[in-house]
Amino acid sequence: MPTDMQDVKDIVREKYASAALKVATGGASCCGSSALPGASPITSNLYDAAQEQGLPAEAMLASLGCGNPTALAQLSPGETVLDLGSGGGIDVLLSARRVGPTGKAYGLDMTDEMLALARDNQRKAGLDNVEFLKGEIEAIPLPDHSVDVIISNCVINLSGDKDRVLREAFRVLKPGGRFAVSDVVTRGEIPEALRRDVLLWVGCLAGALDEADYVAKLAAAGFAQISIEPTRVYDIEDAREFLTGKGIDVDALAPQMQDKFFSGFVRATKPGADGEVPARCCG
């Protein structure tokens, strides 16, 4: 881990503010050839054309995720959803469609520029059951037991206090609530030089939890029915792309990264008030 996580948080904020301004002013996609660090190949081809239909182009262009948590979350009409680190709002808008007018979709983000972009995207999408909140995922500004489902898209890995994030997620979920997150996860030993690199932390790699650690931290927070399903394992060419331009010996380190990082669906459930764990309908 980098020695000063406040510096990392500040760089993360600057990166996402820059991405939001780039989209808002008509710049290229964050995920295109002029991508910011960590934007590609993690963020490519996450949503299908049917999902994108009717969404503002700016919501798609600002997407910096590593999966599609709305496809994972099995949302139902009337539910309340919270997206941790909502960025330009794409997953919040998709969730709002799924939960319908009797439901609610919250987005939480710490970056003013992303919040402004997300609210503009909400206006363009014409969705009233959406609210974007300013705050940090380590201190969620919602009451206990207020949310049915928590989603997040390649954001938890950015936090320097993941235990606190998961405890906060558990706190705001209703009994029986669901945790359905896309994140970058590791499997096997990762070189310490990569773990300490600030740019790779900001790029969603250095801060990624080991698969077993993720499960253990979720369990320690109180969750049950924990599972992690890899959706894309990054190969050596992906590793080279991640490392290029970071001041790192690409030839030496890329082979050590091969098949050790993956995008995954992370699922968990908060036990019910009686301690029972609701059956998961699918998967």
From Swiss-Prot:
Reactions catalysed: arsenic triglutathione + [thioredoxin]-dithiol + S-adenosyl-L-methionine + 2 H2O = methylarsonous acid + [thioredoxin]-disulfide + 3 glutathione + S-adenosyl-L-homocysteine + H(+); arsenic triglutathione + 2 [thioredoxin]-dithiol + 2 S-adenosyl-L-methionine + H2O = dimethylarsinous acid + 2 [thioredoxin]-disulfide + 3 glutathione + 2 S-adenosyl-L-homocysteine + 2 H(+); arsenic triglutathione + 3 [thioredoxin]-dithiol + 3 S-adenosyl-L-methionine = trimethylarsine + 3 [thioredoxin]-disulfide + 3 glutathione + 3 S-adenosyl-L-homocysteine + 3 H(+)
Swiss-Prot/TrEMBL keywords: Arsenical resistance, Methyltransferase, S-adenosyl-L-methionine, Transferase
Pfam families linked: Methyltransf_31 (PF13847)
InterPro entries tied to this protein: Arsenite_MeTrfase-like (IPR026669), Methyltranfer_dom (IPR025714), SAM-dependent_MTases_sf (IPR029063)
Origin: domain of life: Bacteria
Gene Ontology biological-process entries: methylation; response to arsenic-containing substance
A GO MF label: arsenite methyltransferase activity
EC identifiers of the protein: 2.1.1.137
Entries under CDD domains matching the protein: AdoMet_MTases (cd02440)
Functional summary from the UniProt entry: Catalyzes the transfer of a methyl group from AdoMet to arsenite, producing methylated arsenicals. Involved in the conversion of As(III) to a number of di- and trimethylated species, with trimethylarsine as the end product. Reduces the arsenic toxicity in the cell and may contribute to the global arsenic cycling.
Similarity field: Belongs to the methyltransferase superfamily. Arsenite methyltransferase family.
Protein name per Swiss-Prot or TrEMBL: Arsenite methyltransferase
The organism of origin for this protein: Rhodopseudomonas palustris (strain ATCC BAA-98 / CGA009)
Gene: arsM
